[in-house]
Structure formats: C-alpha cells, structure tokens
C-alpha cells in the first residue's frame, strides 16, 4: 500500500455469514456471494504466494491475477467455492472476472505452457478457459454463474449471467444479449453510487435506457438494473447515506 491509503477490510466468520443470510431472507433479500477470480486476487496471493505467478506475490497492483497454469491454484478456487456453497443457499454465484492484469501471464512459464497446450491465443482466451472450467464446476453443484462483462472478451460463456458495468463499452451488453446471455445493467455512467454526486444525479439515473443497438429480442435478456456501492471508503451507515 502507499502512504496515505485508507485501511479497509475485515472478515466474516461462518456464523456471521449465516446470520446475514437469515436476516436478509426474512426481509425478502437474496444474498449472492462474489469471489473475484482470476483478477483482484492480491490479498490471497500476499497470504499464499504460490497462488500467483511469482512476480506478483507481493503487495502491488490490487488486480494481480491467479496463476492459471498451476493446477493447485485451480483446486484452491474450487475449495473456496465449496465452502461458500454451504453458506449461501442462492442458486447464483458471482465469479467476478473483471480488471485482470494479464501482463503477469505473459511472463509466467506455467501460464504460457497452459496456453500452448490448450491452443489459447492470448490472455483473454486463458481467462475464458479458466472461467469455462469454473462454470462447469458451478453447474455440477447446481449453481448459476454471474460475472462482469469482461469475461466475454475471450469468447462466449454459455448460460452465464453478465453484469454490464463498463459504461463506455455499451457493445459488451449488446454482444452478451445477442449471444443469449442474460444481462444485469449497472454501468458506471449511471449506477456507481460511490461516485461523487456531481457525476451521477437522480435525473440521470431515472432517464437510463439500455443501449439503442439492442433489438426487441436482445432486450428480453435484460434482467434489470443494479446499483453498485463499493465500500472501501464507507466504514459506516452514516457515511453510506452522506
């Protein structure tokens, strides 16, 4: 971390997670877990350096990825989710898949070997290979996968639900619906509520519409909207309502 950064984080015990899920259920709210993979993994890599590609196992870029050429890493991912299956009854799980810093894979012998053996052209294809493997794992456990729109950059993800967040990339939402994926709209331009109020006001939110390029058939795959409030700098409910 850099000097002046805000300390945030913490953890939940299994009993605390169960309490949250039960509290939400009693109020008609479904809690869906997200463990971002293969990017946004620096916290795990800092604790377990073998999860990374070697060069990214220290505190650096938050989006440092897991080493996808290491079979032990793949088992780690399955083990993490297996524990969560017992805590969250929701049929949905969110794998993240956004903001992956692929430069580490380009310099990792294991990842390069994985790409060669599976005839994967680039980092996007390697991520797609990983995500498809995880989707098969989720399906085998009766779960449906959700991910951010970058996960489609390496190719189609059958049956995945896509969260379109890149406001400057409306084509991502159009491509997803056209491929038959269900989409939740939450672009930064309208639905990132940790942004300053000058950037997003109520009128702009209420005037949101899906990309004009979507046909009537495409629009049938739009499940709805989501407001995102990232809480790194929101330590309390009072700050949330500020």
Q: Which residue stretches match the model-derived regions?
A:
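Residue-identity detector for threonine
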Residues: 1, 6, 13, 82, ...
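Flexible, acidic glycine-rich loops studded with aromatic residues
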Residues: 144-150, 155-160, 166-242
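Substrate-binding cleft of carbohydrate-active enzyme catalytic domains
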Residues: 1-143
């Amino acid at each position: 971390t850099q000097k002046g950064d805000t300390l945030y984080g913490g953890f939940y015990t299994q009993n605390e997670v169960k309490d949250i899920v039960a509290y939400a259920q009693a109020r008609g709210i479904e809690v869906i877990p997200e463990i971002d993979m293969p990017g946004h993994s620096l916290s795990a890599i800092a604790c377990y350096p073998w999860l990374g590609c070697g060069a990214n196992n220290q505190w650096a870029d938050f989006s440092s990825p897991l080493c996808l050429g290491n079979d032990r890493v793949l088992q780690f991912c399955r083990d993490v989710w297996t524990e969560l299956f017992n805590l969250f009854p929701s049929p949905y799980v969110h794998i993240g898949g956004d903001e992956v810093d692929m430069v580490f894979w380009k310099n990792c012998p294991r990842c390069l070997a994985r790409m060669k053996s599976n005839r994967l052209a680039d980092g996007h294809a390697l991520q797609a290979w990983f995500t498809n493997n995880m989707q098969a794992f989720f399906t085998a456990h009766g779960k449906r996968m959700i991910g951010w729109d970058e996960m489609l950059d390496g190719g189609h993800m059958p049956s995945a639900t896509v969260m379109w967040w890149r406001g400057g990339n409306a084509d991502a939402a159009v491509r997803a619906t056209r491929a038959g994926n269900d989409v939740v709209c939450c672009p930064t331009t309208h639905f990132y509520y940790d942004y300053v109020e000058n950037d997003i006001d109520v009128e702009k939110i209420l005037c949101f519409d899906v990309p004009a390029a979507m046909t009537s058939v495409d629009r049938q795959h739009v499940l709805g909207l989501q407001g995102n409030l990232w809480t790194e700098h929101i330590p309390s409910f009072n700050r949330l309502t500020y």
